[in-house]
Amino acid sequence: MNRLLKTIIENNRKWISEGKVASYIPELSKMDKNLLGISVCTLGGEEYWEGDAEVKFTIQSISKIVTLMLAIIDNGEDYVFSKVGMEPTETAFNSIVNLEAKESHKPINPMINAGAIVVASMVAGKDSDEKFDRILKFTRKISGNNDIDINLNVYESEKETGHRNRALAYFMKSTGALKGNVEEILDVYFKQCSIEITCKDLARIGVMLANDGVSPYTGDRIVPRHVARIVKTIMVTCGMYDASGNFAVHIGIPAKSGVGGGIIACAPRRMGIGVLGTALDEKGNSIAGTKILEELSKQLDLSIF
């Protein structure tokens, strides 16, 4: 497996030149464009990795699957999906278009920024600190890594420049789609996006999802089966922003990307995968990371379709 991963990384390193690091968050623009790594965890608990698999980077939008799991556990799926939809979108992840066009003003799915902000508001906690503390502890639990923490520099950078997210949140507040203190909810959202992880952490979360919520390392149930299945389904339909259909056709496994360059993926009942490629395409997905997953999926016949 390690030889295969090494070959796949080298085969797809050429794609880095076609992407750019995220620049709209100043702290992310400092990232090394050439980072490329992969980690794979099997249902048997075996771990393989190559490249920059142990380099820390911020989770960004991959945190949306973490908070979605937690919000469903806290509130039940019926309540969560009464506040946020579950349909794919053809618009960008930070678009306001559907919020204005739809009569309910409900965000179209939990993987776009507007939807994730509403989901963050549904995580239980008496204030923003308690909500984020629960998100951080849950991230540590599902990854099996108690050392995971927030990158405060990225958090401050996001908070200072998150004007589009503020616009989305205040628009939803004006229509009644978002309840609570907007600045406190945004603080939770900016913090969750600034959690620092590695490819190895993502692969361990991925294999837990691949195993329907059970840790292959301990045999313990970490997430209810129905929650794991809901999240995997949303990952397939919405996880790669407005490139989710293309990803499903060419790779065919549940995945979620983040503008920090990470992608988490899982092949149900087979493996979890974490990829890092900091150079992004115009949709905000890792360009080399996507190509790596495409080759891995073809080599191992991972597609669920």
From Swiss-Prot:
Sequence positions that bind substrate: 61, 113, 158, 165, 189, 241, 259
Secretion signal, residue range per the UniProt entry: none
Molecular function terms, GO-annotated: glutaminase activity
Gene Ontology BP term (one): glutamine catabolic process
Subunit structure: Homotetramer.
Any Pfam family: Glutaminase
Protein origin, superkingdom: Bacteria
Family: Belongs to the glutaminase family.
Gene: glsA
Gene3D superfamilies to which the protein is assigned, alphabetical: DD-peptidase/beta-lactamase superfamily (3.40.710.10)
Assigned EC number: 3.5.1.2
Keyword Flavoprotein: no
Lineage: Bacteria, Bacillati, Bacillota, Clostridia, Eubacteriales
Name of the protein in question: Glutaminase
Keywords, alphabetical: Hydrolase
Catalysed transformations (reactions): L-glutamine + H2O = L-glutamate + NH4(+)
Root EC class: hydrolase
Keyword Hydrolase: yes
